[in-house]
Amino acid sequence: MRRRDVVKLAALSAAGLVLPKTVRAAAKQIPVIDTHIHLFDTTRTWGVPWPAKDDLALFKPALPPRYVDLSAKHGVVGAIAIEASPLKSDNDWLLKVVAENPVMVGMIGDLIPGTPSYMADLERLQKNPLFLGIRYGNIWDRDLSIDLDKPGFVDGLKALAKAGLTFDSANPDEKLLAALLKTSEQIPDLRIVVDHLPHAVVPAEATEQKQHFDRLQALAKNPRVFVKLSEIPILVDGTLVTDPSAYTEHLDAIWEIFGEDHILFGSDWPNSDHVAPYDATFSIVQQYISGKSAKAGEKYFWKNSIAAYRWRPRRANQHLASI
Protein backbone atom coordinates (compact mmCIF):
# COMPACT_ATOMS: atom_id res chain seq x y z
CA MET A 1 0.00 0.00 0.00
CA ARG A 2 1.57 3.21 -1.12
CA ARG A 3 0.92 6.27 0.98
CA ARG A 4 -1.01 7.94 -1.80
CA ASP A 5 -3.28 4.90 -1.97
CA VAL A 6 -4.60 5.88 1.43
CA VAL A 7 -6.13 8.96 -0.17
CA LYS A 8 -9.45 8.00 -1.70
CA LEU A 9 -10.66 9.86 -4.72
CA ALA A 10 -13.90 10.54 -2.92
CA ALA A 11 -11.98 12.50 -0.31
CA LEU A 12 -10.50 14.94 -2.75
CA SER A 13 -12.98 17.69 -2.07
CA ALA A 14 -11.68 21.19 -1.69
CA ALA A 15 -12.60 21.29 1.98
CA GLY A 16 -11.59 24.45 3.78
CA LEU A 17 -9.37 24.15 6.82
CA VAL A 18 -11.39 26.20 9.31
CA LEU A 19 -10.99 24.98 12.87
CA PRO A 20 -13.88 24.94 15.35
CA LYS A 21 -13.65 27.70 17.96
CA THR A 22 -13.21 25.14 20.75
CA VAL A 23 -10.24 23.59 18.97
CA ARG A 24 -8.65 26.97 18.26
CA ALA A 25 -9.08 27.99 21.89
CA ALA A 26 -7.49 24.77 23.14
CA ALA A 27 -4.57 25.16 20.74
CA LYS A 28 -3.84 28.63 22.12
CA GLN A 29 -3.30 27.12 25.57
CA ILE A 30 -0.44 24.92 24.39
CA PRO A 31 2.98 26.43 23.53
CA VAL A 32 3.74 24.86 20.15
CA ILE A 33 7.33 23.87 19.35
CA ASP A 34 8.05 23.19 15.69
CA THR A 35 10.82 20.59 15.75
CA HIS A 36 11.71 20.73 12.08
CA ILE A 37 12.47 23.89 10.14
CA HIS A 38 15.37 24.77 7.87
CA LEU A 39 17.21 28.09 7.92
CA PHE A 40 19.45 29.45 5.18
CA ASP A 41 20.38 32.75 3.58
CA THR A 42 20.49 32.67 -0.20
CA THR A 43 22.01 36.16 -0.23
CA ARG A 44 25.25 34.95 1.38
CA THR A 45 28.24 35.88 -0.73
CA TRP A 46 29.49 32.28 -0.66
CA GLY A 47 26.08 30.82 -1.48
CA VAL A 48 24.24 27.83 -0.02
CA PRO A 49 24.44 24.09 -0.86
CA TRP A 50 20.64 23.93 -0.71
CA PRO A 51 18.19 24.92 -2.10
CA ALA A 52 19.21 25.09 -5.74
CA LYS A 53 19.02 28.43 -7.52
CA ASP A 54 16.39 27.10 -9.91
CA ASP A 55 14.09 26.08 -7.04
CA LEU A 56 11.63 28.94 -7.42
CA ALA A 57 9.60 27.90 -4.38
CA LEU A 58 12.52 27.92 -1.96
CA PHE A 59 15.40 30.02 -3.26
CA LYS A 60 15.02 33.06 -1.03
CA PRO A 61 16.21 33.73 2.52
CA ALA A 62 14.58 31.48 5.11
CA LEU A 63 15.38 33.13 8.43
CA PRO A 64 13.61 33.35 11.82
CA PRO A 65 11.72 36.65 11.28
CA ARG A 66 10.04 35.29 8.14
CA TYR A 67 9.23 32.05 9.94
CA VAL A 68 7.68 33.87 12.90
CA ASP A 69 5.46 35.90 10.57
CA LEU A 70 4.01 32.64 9.25
CA SER A 71 3.82 30.57 12.41
CA ALA A 72 3.07 32.83 15.39
CA LYS A 73 -0.67 33.00 14.66
CA HIS A 74 -0.80 29.23 15.13
CA GLY A 75 0.59 29.42 18.65
CA VAL A 76 4.13 28.48 17.67
CA VAL A 77 6.46 29.91 20.32
CA GLY A 78 9.66 28.04 19.48
CA ALA A 79 11.38 26.04 16.77
CA ILE A 80 14.35 23.76 16.20
CA ALA A 81 16.49 24.34 13.12
CA ILE A 82 17.64 21.25 11.24
CA GLU A 83 20.89 21.84 9.36
CA ALA A 84 20.40 21.91 5.60
CA SER A 85 24.05 21.98 4.61
CA PRO A 86 26.90 19.42 4.60
CA LEU A 87 29.46 22.19 5.15
CA LYS A 88 31.07 21.86 8.56
CA SER A 89 31.34 25.63 8.85
CA ASP A 90 27.57 25.95 8.52
CA ASN A 91 27.15 24.40 11.96
CA ASP A 92 28.66 27.59 13.35
CA TRP A 93 26.69 29.79 10.95
CA LEU A 94 23.43 28.16 12.02
CA LEU A 95 24.32 28.31 15.72
CA LYS A 96 24.91 32.04 15.36
CA VAL A 97 21.54 32.60 13.66
CA VAL A 98 19.79 30.50 16.31
CA ALA A 99 21.54 32.33 19.16
CA GLU A 100 20.44 35.72 17.79
CA ASN A 101 16.77 34.70 17.66
CA PRO A 102 15.24 33.53 20.98
CA VAL A 103 12.29 31.95 19.19
CA MET A 104 14.80 29.27 18.20
CA VAL A 105 15.27 26.81 21.07
CA GLY A 106 18.09 24.91 19.39
CA MET A 107 19.56 23.35 16.27
CA ILE A 108 20.51 19.95 14.90
CA GLY A 109 23.86 20.06 13.15
CA ASP A 110 25.62 18.08 10.45
CA LEU A 111 28.68 16.03 11.38
CA ILE A 112 29.91 12.71 10.02
CA PRO A 113 30.77 10.20 12.78
CA GLY A 114 34.07 8.45 12.28
CA THR A 115 35.76 11.24 10.35
CA PRO A 116 39.08 12.53 11.75
CA SER A 117 37.67 15.78 13.13
CA TYR A 118 34.34 14.42 14.37
CA MET A 119 35.15 13.95 18.06
CA ALA A 120 36.80 17.36 18.34
CA ASP A 121 33.95 19.05 16.47
CA LEU A 122 31.38 17.34 18.66
CA GLU A 123 33.20 18.27 21.84
CA ARG A 124 33.40 21.91 20.74
CA LEU A 125 29.83 22.24 19.51
CA GLN A 126 28.21 20.51 22.47
CA LYS A 127 29.51 23.24 24.77
CA ASN A 128 26.80 25.44 23.28
CA PRO A 129 23.44 24.46 24.86
CA LEU A 130 21.69 25.36 21.60
CA PHE A 131 23.47 22.47 19.87
CA LEU A 132 21.06 19.55 20.30
CA GLY A 133 22.54 16.83 18.10
CA ILE A 134 23.21 15.78 14.51
CA ARG A 135 21.24 14.58 11.50
CA TYR A 136 22.17 11.63 9.30
CA GLY A 137 20.36 9.50 6.74
CA ASN A 138 19.19 9.74 3.14
CA ILE A 139 20.78 13.09 2.47
CA TRP A 140 24.05 14.25 0.88
CA ASP A 141 24.53 10.80 -0.73
CA ARG A 142 24.96 9.11 2.64
CA ASP A 143 23.90 5.59 3.55
CA LEU A 144 23.53 4.78 7.23
CA SER A 145 23.26 1.05 6.55
CA ILE A 146 26.76 1.09 5.05
CA ASP A 147 28.29 3.73 7.28
CA LEU A 148 27.42 1.87 10.49
CA ASP A 149 30.15 -0.62 9.57
CA LYS A 150 32.80 2.01 8.93
CA PRO A 151 35.58 2.39 11.52
CA GLY A 152 34.71 4.87 14.23
CA PHE A 153 31.13 5.49 13.13
CA VAL A 154 29.38 3.66 15.96
CA ASP A 155 31.88 5.07 18.46
CA GLY A 156 30.93 8.51 17.19
CA LEU A 157 27.26 7.82 17.86
CA LYS A 158 28.11 6.45 21.29
CA ALA A 159 29.86 9.74 22.02
CA LEU A 160 26.71 11.55 20.90
CA ALA A 161 24.65 9.46 23.32
CA LYS A 162 27.11 10.00 26.16
CA ALA A 163 26.83 13.75 25.61
CA GLY A 164 23.04 13.51 25.95
CA LEU A 165 22.50 14.67 22.37
CA THR A 166 20.01 13.51 19.75
CA PHE A 167 20.42 11.59 16.49
CA ASP A 168 17.96 12.85 13.84
CA SER A 169 17.38 10.76 10.73
CA ALA A 170 16.66 12.02 7.23
CA ASN A 171 13.99 10.90 4.76
CA PRO A 172 13.14 7.31 5.78
CA ASP A 173 12.80 4.37 3.44
CA GLU A 174 12.91 0.66 4.32
CA LYS A 175 16.70 0.53 4.17
CA LEU A 176 17.09 3.51 6.49
CA LEU A 177 14.45 2.24 8.92
CA ALA A 178 16.34 -1.06 9.14
CA ALA A 179 19.58 0.83 9.79
CA LEU A 180 17.90 2.94 12.48
CA LEU A 181 16.65 -0.21 14.17
CA LYS A 182 20.16 -1.64 14.10
CA THR A 183 21.47 1.63 15.54
CA SER A 184 18.92 1.57 18.37
CA GLU A 185 19.90 -2.00 19.19
CA GLN A 186 23.63 -1.28 19.15
CA ILE A 187 23.31 1.98 21.12
CA PRO A 188 20.10 1.65 23.17
CA ASP A 189 20.77 4.82 25.17
CA LEU A 190 20.96 7.00 22.03
CA ARG A 191 17.91 9.21 21.50
CA ILE A 192 16.76 8.78 17.90
CA VAL A 193 14.23 10.92 16.05
CA VAL A 194 12.76 9.46 12.85
CA ASP A 195 11.72 12.41 10.73
CA HIS A 196 9.06 12.56 8.01
CA LEU A 197 7.68 9.10 8.79
CA PRO A 198 4.25 9.88 7.24
CA HIS A 199 6.03 10.45 3.94
CA ALA A 200 7.70 7.03 3.92
CA VAL A 201 6.23 4.69 1.31
CA VAL A 202 4.50 1.68 2.84
CA PRO A 203 5.29 -1.37 0.66
CA ALA A 204 2.36 -2.77 -1.31
CA GLU A 205 3.51 -6.39 -1.26
CA ALA A 206 2.11 -8.22 1.79
CA THR A 207 5.35 -9.69 3.12
CA GLU A 208 7.26 -6.44 2.69
CA GLN A 209 4.40 -4.51 4.27
CA LYS A 210 4.48 -6.79 7.31
CA GLN A 211 8.24 -6.30 7.56
CA HIS A 212 7.70 -2.54 7.45
CA PHE A 213 5.29 -2.51 10.36
CA ASP A 214 7.28 -5.11 12.30
CA ARG A 215 10.29 -2.84 11.96
CA LEU A 216 8.34 0.14 13.27
CA GLN A 217 7.04 -1.95 16.17
CA ALA A 218 10.61 -2.97 17.02
CA LEU A 219 11.77 0.66 16.91
CA ALA A 220 8.89 1.69 19.15
CA LYS A 221 10.03 -0.74 21.86
CA ASN A 222 12.98 1.56 22.55
CA PRO A 223 11.67 4.41 24.75
CA ARG A 224 14.36 6.70 23.34
CA VAL A 225 12.98 6.53 19.80
CA PHE A 226 10.69 9.36 18.67
CA VAL A 227 9.00 10.10 15.35
CA LYS A 228 7.89 13.30 13.66
CA LEU A 229 4.52 13.64 12.02
CA SER A 230 6.11 15.81 9.36
CA GLU A 231 5.87 15.95 5.56
CA ILE A 232 2.19 15.07 5.85
CA PRO A 233 0.48 17.13 3.07
CA ILE A 234 0.28 15.48 -0.34
CA LEU A 235 -0.72 16.47 -3.84
CA VAL A 236 -2.99 14.45 -6.10
CA ASP A 237 -2.88 15.49 -9.75
CA GLY A 238 -1.14 18.68 -8.65
CA THR A 239 -3.84 19.62 -6.13
CA LEU A 240 -3.31 19.76 -2.38
CA VAL A 241 -5.46 17.28 -0.49
CA THR A 242 -7.10 19.43 2.18
CA ASP A 243 -9.62 16.98 3.63
CA PRO A 244 -8.09 15.92 6.99
CA SER A 245 -9.92 12.59 6.89
CA ALA A 246 -7.82 11.59 3.89
CA TYR A 247 -4.78 11.40 6.16
CA THR A 248 -6.37 9.76 9.20
CA GLU A 249 -5.78 6.07 8.44
CA HIS A 250 -2.09 6.52 7.76
CA LEU A 251 -1.45 8.79 10.75
CA ASP A 252 -3.48 6.53 13.03
CA ALA A 253 -1.22 3.59 12.14
CA ILE A 254 1.87 5.56 13.21
CA TRP A 255 0.16 6.90 16.33
CA GLU A 256 -0.94 3.43 17.42
CA ILE A 257 2.58 2.03 17.07
CA PHE A 258 4.57 4.79 18.77
CA GLY A 259 1.99 6.22 21.15
CA GLU A 260 1.30 9.74 22.32
CA ASP A 261 4.56 10.00 24.31
CA HIS A 262 6.87 9.62 21.29
CA ILE A 263 5.37 11.67 18.47
CA LEU A 264 6.42 15.24 17.62
CA PHE A 265 5.23 18.14 15.50
CA GLY A 266 7.47 19.28 12.67
CA SER A 267 6.47 21.45 9.72
CA ASP A 268 9.54 20.96 7.48
CA TRP A 269 9.29 24.66 6.59
CA PRO A 270 10.21 26.01 4.08
CA ASN A 271 10.70 22.72 2.23
CA SER A 272 7.00 22.15 2.86
CA ASP A 273 6.25 25.08 0.54
CA HIS A 274 6.77 22.69 -2.37
CA VAL A 275 3.44 21.13 -1.41
CA ALA A 276 1.51 23.50 0.84
CA PRO A 277 1.76 26.89 2.57
CA TYR A 278 2.46 26.89 6.30
CA ASP A 279 -1.17 27.59 7.19
CA ALA A 280 -2.38 24.47 5.39
CA THR A 281 0.47 22.31 6.71
CA PHE A 282 -0.34 23.30 10.28
CA SER A 283 -4.11 23.08 9.87
CA ILE A 284 -4.04 19.53 8.50
CA VAL A 285 -2.14 18.24 11.50
CA GLN A 286 -4.07 20.43 13.95
CA GLN A 287 -7.34 18.95 12.78
CA TYR A 288 -5.91 15.46 13.18
CA ILE A 289 -4.66 16.17 16.70
CA SER A 290 -7.98 17.78 17.64
CA GLY A 291 -9.40 14.26 17.65
CA LYS A 292 -7.01 13.31 20.46
CA SER A 293 -7.20 14.26 24.12
CA ALA A 294 -5.97 17.64 25.32
CA LYS A 295 -3.16 15.81 27.11
CA ALA A 296 -2.09 14.11 23.89
CA GLY A 297 -2.15 17.44 22.06
CA GLU A 298 0.03 19.01 24.73
CA LYS A 299 2.54 16.18 24.38
CA TYR A 300 2.56 16.30 20.59
CA PHE A 301 2.98 20.04 20.24
CA TRP A 302 5.22 20.71 23.24
CA LYS A 303 6.22 18.18 25.90
CA ASN A 304 7.54 15.43 23.66
CA SER A 305 9.94 17.85 21.99
CA ILE A 306 11.60 18.41 25.36
CA ALA A 307 11.94 14.66 25.94
CA ALA A 308 13.39 14.13 22.46
CA TYR A 309 15.75 17.11 22.29
CA ARG A 310 16.29 18.33 25.87
CA TRP A 311 15.98 21.93 24.70
CA ARG A 312 15.87 24.75 27.23
CA PRO A 313 13.32 27.58 27.17
CA ARG A 314 14.67 30.98 26.15
CA ARG A 315 11.42 32.93 26.51
CA ALA A 316 8.72 32.91 29.17
CA ASN A 317 6.05 31.81 26.68
CA GLN A 318 7.97 28.61 25.94
CA HIS A 319 6.81 27.34 29.36
CA LEU A 320 3.32 25.87 29.58
CA ALA A 321 2.76 27.52 32.95
CA SER A 322 3.12 30.96 31.36
CA ILE A 323 0.34 30.51 28.81
How would you name each of these model-derived features?
Residues 89-103, 247-254, 278-288:
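Short, electropositive alpha-helical surface patch
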Residues 147-264, 313-323:
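Catalytic pocket-lining loop regions of alpha/beta-barrel enzymes
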Residues 88-175, 181-182, 228-234, 239-241:
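Active-site gating/metal-coordination segments in enzymes
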Residues 37, 84, 197, 268-269:
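Active-site metal-binding loops of divalent metal-dependent hydrolases
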Residues 2-19, 30-35, 60-78, 252-253, ...:
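Mid-to-C-terminal alpha-helical segments outside catalytic/metal-binding sites
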